[in-house]
């Protein structure tokens, strides 16, 4: 991988120029604040740096580097920010490489073109490579030798251009009337002119545009007119050729000098003769030639599809061939060939640099993902709210269940062994079987008395048996709001065998023990106090008489009505409550 500078107008790359003259520094990807400063300084649109992105040292001031020894590499300070982005233009104006030599060589080439009218001089100039190489004066000055050769070729090119213009003035009707022979002749002339112009360009390019490298690539291959060095560096560094071709017209590739020379020697001309710079004309079978108005491009033309036609060469060309020449007009076919030749190398570089081909597509994907994440987060919030509501409801139900458990007394049947069946009811208490079970007051009971304020209460009644000829009962009252325990009462209900006479024996938490007797008629029991005993410190006024009435109504609910008489008040209704059966 060749390390290149990511600045827009900078052509510096690794291996170019003297060693250690230019150093390359990575973008601070881990420091977001400093990375934003670098991106603002670089000013590149739709571009994101990666670990393969570098900036050369020419974009930093001298105080941006730490002081080190001369043989050590440059080291940026932790706060260094690039601020210089016009060094390329200043360097050229200072006279380092290009323009002064172009002016000098341009003057020399202009002098040689003035002598191109003499055919003898033209031949001498065309043969200057062999003569100059044989002369002893050329050995101490190899650079002058290199410059003399392009000048001679420039003179030959000027002579052939004059001849081509004279041939171009002939009327088009004469060309159309000529036949296949005249067409082949014109094609051979066009190919010869093309070869001559190519040879002239080989000589004129280094003289007019700078020195030629040993590999045959001139400096203008990296700084094409109208596009700038940034396009070539961009195609190598971060831009994909395919996405760039969609934004702007792709550049027509320009082959280096050595590649042109090899192709011109290898490919035959239209008429079978193709003059080269060092070889004579060679015979080859005629083939179809392009029209005279088509531009000269360095890309290979597609051969005619036939049985003996060789396969099309789609090998990826060097990226330097994708640079457009100054006076070339690319046809649609040549553009496709440029895409085929340059896309391979650019795709390889894109895969190495791990860049995406479309930043807009990635942004749209990120937006879609954000919308989906927000939607899922909203659904998750609603689910959490529902779960919290259900949790609160479950908590309330558990609290109510715990309250009911605290209110209820343990059943007497729970004292029996777990594997034992419930006891069989005695036939003596069968007339009172409709009273068995656990009952809860619904609605709450009401209490009144002349000496008391009206009140309401909750009550649980539990009536059961253990196989004996009697019933066990307990009545537990609670405050309806605070569930505070209030009146409590428990005892036994006995029946006289073979009669309907019932005795009710109870003990209350108020310090009273009473015996009530009465009769049962169907599903109704009426009893009245027979004797009442109380503790010595019982609260006054003392209770002197109590009556009760139990009844099972048509809805299957149990009703109880209690009346009471004290030392100060006559017999008056005191309590009334309706029970609903909970368990049998």
UniProtKB/Swiss-Prot annotation:
Heme b binds at residues 451, 574. CDD domains: lipocalin_heme-bd-THAP4-like (cd07828). Transmembrane segments: none annotated. Residues 89-104 have a biased composition (Basic residues). Residues 158-178, 248-267 have a biased composition (Basic and acidic residues). The keyword DNA-binding applies. The modification Phosphoserine is found at residue 240. Its EC number is 5.99.-.-. InterPro entries: Calycin (IPR012674), Nitrobindin (IPR045165), THAP4-like_heme-bd (IPR014878), THAP_Znf (IPR006612), THAP_Znf_sf (IPR038441). It comes from the Eukaryota. GO terms for molecular function: DNA binding; nitric oxide binding; peroxynitrite isomerase activity; zinc ion binding. Its cofactor is heme b. A zinc finger (THAP-type) spans 1-85. One of its GO terms (biological process) is nitrate metabolic process. Residues 122-138, 190-208 have a biased composition (Low complexity). PANTHER family: PEROXYNITRITE ISOMERASE THAP4 (PTHR15854:SF4), THAP4 PROTEIN (PTHR15854). Homodimer. The C-terminal nitrobindin region coordinates a heme and bears the isomerase activity. The N-terminal zinc finger domain likely binds DNA and may be involved in transcriptional regulation. Heme-binding protein able to scavenge peroxynitrite and to protect free L-tyrosine against peroxynitrite-mediated nitration, by acting as a peroxynitrite isomerase that converts peroxynitrite to nitrate. Therefore, this protein likely plays a role in peroxynitrite sensing and in the detoxification of reactive nitrogen and oxygen species (RNS and ROS, respectively). Is able to bind nitric oxide (NO) in vitro, but may act as a sensor of peroxynitrite levels in vivo, possibly modulating the transcriptional activity residing in the N-terminal region. This is Peroxynitrite isomerase THAP4.
């Amino acid at each position: 991988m060749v390390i290149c500078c990511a600045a827009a107008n900078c052509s510096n790359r690794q291996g170019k120029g003297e060693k250690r003259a230019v150093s390359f520094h990575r973008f601070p990807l881990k420091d977001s604040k400093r990375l934003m400063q670098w991106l603002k300084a670089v000013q590149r649109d739709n571009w994101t740096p990666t670990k393969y992105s570098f900036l050369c040292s020419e974009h930093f001031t001298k105080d941006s580097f730490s002081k080190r020894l001369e043989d050590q590499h440059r080291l940026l300070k932790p706060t260094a920010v690039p601020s210089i982005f016009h060094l390329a233009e200043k360097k050229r104006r200072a006279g380092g490489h290009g323009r002064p030599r172009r002016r000098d060589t341009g003057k020399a080439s202009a002098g040689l073109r003035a002598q191109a009218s003499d055919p003898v001089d033209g031949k001498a100039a065309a043969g200057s490579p062999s003569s100059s190489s044989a002369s002893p004066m050329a050995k101490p000055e190899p650079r002058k030798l290199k410059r003399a050769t392009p000048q001679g070729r420039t003179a030959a090119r000027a002579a052939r251009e004059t001849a081509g213009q004279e041939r171009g003035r002939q009327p088009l009707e004469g060309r159309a009337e000529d036949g296949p022979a005249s067409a082949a002749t014109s094609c051979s002339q066009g190919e010869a002119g093309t070869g001559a112009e190519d040879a002239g360009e080989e000589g004129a390019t280094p003289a007019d545009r700078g020195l030629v490298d040993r590999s045959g690539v001139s400096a203008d291959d990296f700084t094409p007119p109208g596009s700038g060095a940034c396009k070539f560096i961009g195609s190598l560094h971060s831009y994909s050729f395919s996405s760039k071709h969609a934004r702007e017209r792709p550049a027509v590739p320009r082959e280096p000098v050595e590649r042109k020379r090899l192709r011109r020697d290898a490919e035959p001309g239209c008429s079978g003769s193709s003059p080269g710079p060092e070889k004579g004309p060679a015979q080859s079978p005629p083939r179809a030639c392009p029209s005279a108005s088509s531009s000269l491009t360095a890309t290979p033309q597609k051969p005619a599809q036939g049985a003996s036609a060789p396969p099309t060469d789609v090998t990826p060309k060097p990226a330097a061939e994708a640079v457009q020449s100054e006076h070339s007009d690319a046809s649609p076919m040549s553009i496709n060939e440029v895409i085929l030749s340059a896309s391979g190398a650019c795709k390889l570089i894109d895969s190495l640099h791990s860049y995406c081909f479309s930043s807009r597509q990635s942004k749209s994907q990120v937006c879609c993902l954000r919308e989906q994440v927000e939607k899922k987060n909203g659904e998750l919030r609603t689910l959490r709210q529902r779960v919290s509501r259900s949790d609160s409801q479950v908590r309330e139900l558990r609290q109510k269940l715990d309250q009911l458990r605290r209110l209820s007394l343990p059943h007497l049947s729970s004292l029996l062994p777990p594997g034992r069946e419930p006891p069989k009811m005695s036939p003596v208490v069968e007339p009172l079987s409709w009273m068995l079970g656990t009952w809860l007051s619904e609605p709450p009971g009401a209490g009144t008395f002349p000496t008391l304020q009206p009140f309401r209460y909750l009550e649980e009644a539990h009536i059961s048996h253990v196989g004996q000829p009697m019933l066990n009962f307990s009545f537990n009252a609670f405050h309806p709001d605070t569930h505070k325990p209030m009146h409590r009462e428990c005892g036994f209900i006995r029946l006289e065998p073979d009669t309907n006479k019932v005795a009710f024996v109870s003990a209350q938490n108020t310090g009273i023990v009473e015996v009530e007797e009465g009769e049962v008629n169907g599903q109704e029991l009426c009893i009245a106090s027979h004797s009442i005993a109380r503790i010595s410190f019982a609260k006054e006024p003392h209770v002197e008489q109590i009556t009760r009435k139990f009844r099972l109504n048509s809805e299957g609910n149990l009703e109880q009505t209690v009346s009471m008489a004290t030392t100060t008040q006559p017999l008056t209704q005191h309590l009334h409550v309706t029970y609903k059966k909970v368990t049998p």
